[in-house]
Each structure stands twice: as C-alpha cells, then as structure tokens.
Amino acid sequence: MKPLGTPLSPDATRVMLLGSGELGKEVLIALQRLGVETIAVDRYDNAPGQQVAHQSHTIAMSDPAALRTLIEAERPDLVVPEIEAIATQTLEALEAEGVVRVIPTARATRLTMDREGIRRLAAETLGLPTSPYRFCDSLAELQAAIDGADGQPAIGYPCIVKPVMSSSGKGQSKIDGPADVQAAWDYAMVGGRVSNGRVIVEGFIDFDYEITQLTVRALGADGQVETHFCDPIGHVQVRGDYVESWQPHPMQPAALALSRHIARTVTDNLGGQGLFGVELFVKGDLVWFSEVSPRPHDTGMVTMITQWQNEFELHARAILGLPVSTALKSPGASAVIYGGVDAPGVVYDGVDEALRVPNSEIRLFGKPESFERRRMGVALVHDADVDVARTQAKLAAGKVKARPA
C-alpha cells in the first residue's frame, strides 16, 4: 500500500465497501480512524454504513455493468466486499485489468459467494473434513439425495437444507423426516439471495458445539503474510441465524489445534490479506469445516468488548498492511437485539435500563426499517466469567424494545 493520506484530498487512501450493513459500518469506522476516505455502497438507501461514510452510492451490486461503472468512476485503492450478492466476475475482471485491488482477492470473493464454491474447495480440493453433502436443483433431486440414488450414499435423516446463496440463516431448515422435505424446499426457494433454485443438503452432525475461528492474514515486519488467530468464539444459531456469541469458548488442546489447522489451510488457499470468519463444528477432538467468510463475521461482534483490537479493526489494519494483535482484553458475550415489529424509522425504549446492566454496552445499527426478526442491534457484556457475561448480555438485549415512531 502507498502511505496513508488525508481524506478528501488528492493523496487520500480510498476504500470502497460493497455492502454497508452493521458489519460494514464498523469496518468503515475503523478505516476512518486510520485516516482512510471511505465509500459505502449498498442496494438500499440509508444503510448503516452509508450513514457514516464520506461518500455513498445505492446500486444493484449484482449488476455487472452498474458495478463496473461505479468502480471505474470512483477508482478506489481497495474494494472490500461485505456481502455475497455481488457480480464477482466483474471484480475478477477489474482486478485482472489492474483497475482495483479486491480484498482479500477477487478469487476468494467468488469462491465464498455461495456455499457450493467454498464447500467444493474445502472438501474436494483441500480434503478438509465436512458433513456429507449434495447439491440439488429440484425437489426430486433433494429427495433422491436424502434417500440415496444413482449409486450415491443416502444423506439420510435428519439433514440440513440451505440455499446455495443466503445470509443470516435465511432459507435454512432441518429435515427430520419425509414430511418435512416439501416445506424445507419451499423455504429455501424464498430464502435465497438469488432465484436459481439450487440448494445444498447436508448430513446432520451431532456436534458438541460450534465455533467461529477468526483468522487474520496480515503482513509481518518482513513484509510477508503471517496468520494470526483470535481466541475461539462460541455461538448459538437458530435456523442458521446468530443469536448470541461469547469469547473465549473453552476447547481441548487437540480440538483447538485441529480447528486452527483447518482455518489456516482454507485461508492460505484463499490468500490475500484481511480477516476471515471460519465456522467449525466440534465433537470431542473431532472438527468439521462448515463455512468461511472472507470478512468480519456476525458472531465476531463480541470482540467489540473482548479484544483490544476488535474484528473490524483487525480487518482494517490487515488490508492496509498494518500490524495486528489478537490479544484478549476480557472474556465477554454478545446477544442480538431484534426489531420485534415491522415498521420504518423505529424508536428504542429501554436503552437506559440495558446500560444499567453491569459491564454492558449497546450498539444500535441504525437500520432504516425494522422487521420482527431483523437484527437491529447487539448487547455486549464483559465479565471474568463467560457464563455470567452470557446471562447478562441476554438480559441487556431483552430490555431494548423497538416501536414505531
């Protein structure tokens, strides 16, 4: 990278985020604290990140022509994808043409944009342990994959069905028996980010717990990329959507070592610089790869209260070629604050009560419209005892209520 400049000047270091939700908003703030000029892009106006960026644009980021036009007009030093629904072939072309550098790389963005690319990389190319899986394009194919057909072993019941492209658990469900298959297929069709009718069905792993292993690829003093690991983050998901997380999650040494081996293997292959959220299932000393995001992870919001450098600051530092530290400041936990109502421009009651919970912090994301199950904020609590922090974070989150203005 060139030396950091001054925002809104000819020498500014300019970074464009594609996707400006709550995670992107925190990345933008971290970049601005390092003197970076920021450009926030999203598919709807007044997205959280657009509210804090120097400049903002609203486009369909999956439209190749619109995306190319915007990037060529703005000419940022870095493009940082923060969501999956992006015209990744356009990013690959622009990177190959030398127009822009994509974080971590355009290839990594393409491979992780949907579950098929990254699952085939992890299981078939890298040989990492995963759940058994099939990709299906119809209800009939889904049923055949579960039952076993064409010489393929049956996925069986129970199993998990997900759209190949979705976020926050949308379209994901568990199938316990034949009576659930039709409903799971229908839910996947309405929950995907694109309407291509393709799903992944996975055999169910009876894991003890699941973690996110935040993994940072950053330049060392010698200019070579080094890999850093945050303490493991435990989390609870409901239908694939993050509900609460905590750090550190206790792990046996063998399981922790295997988790980090898997995380290093997949992130080394994806390459580039930045923070990756690697999701893993753990049972005893066995570990299975689930997914990876080449960007800050929703379960990693807990690091805003647990680490000296949170996941957003780590991402910002790493992509700018700056030193990083993954040191833990205090154990802690996070719990989601839901909208609870369907309404635009809500107001929040109970914030004062939430902040009376000892060692608590609240982040309200500023989303312009609330839905009943939309993530509108997060409660954060630090405590020497992680279990206490979890209880207190959920207590604080439950005190914040959105209502129509």
Swiss-Prot record:
Nucleotide-binding among keywords: yes
SUPFAM superfamilies tied to this protein: Glutathione synthetase ATP-binding domain-like, PreATP-grasp domain, Rudiment single hybrid motif
Catalytic activity, as annotated: N(1)-(5-phospho-beta-D-ribosyl)glycinamide + formate + ATP = N(2)-formyl-N(1)-(5-phospho-beta-D-ribosyl)glycinamide + ADP + phosphate + H(+)
Residue ranges of domain ATP-grasp in the record: 120-320
Pfam families the record matches: ATP-grasp, PurT_C, RS_preATP-grasp-like
Keywords: ATP-binding, Ligase, Magnesium, Metal-binding, Nucleotide-binding, Purine biosynthesis
Chain sites annotated for binding N(1)-(5-phospho-beta-D-ribosyl)glycinamide: E22, L23, E82, D298, K367, R374, R375
One of the protein's GO biological processes: 'de novo' IMP biosynthetic process
Function: Involved in the de novo purine biosynthesis. Catalyzes the transfer of formate to 5-phospho-ribosyl-glycinamide (GAR), producing 5-phospho-ribosyl-N-formylglycinamide (FGAR). Formate is provided by PurU via hydrolysis of 10-formyl-tetrahydrofolate.
Name of the protein: Formate-dependent phosphoribosylglycinamide formyltransferase
Biological source species: Leptothrix cholodnii (strain ATCC 51168 / LMG 8142 / SP-6) (Leptothrix discophora (strain SP-6))
Organism ancestry: Bacteria, Pseudomonadati, Pseudomonadota, Betaproteobacteria, Burkholderiales
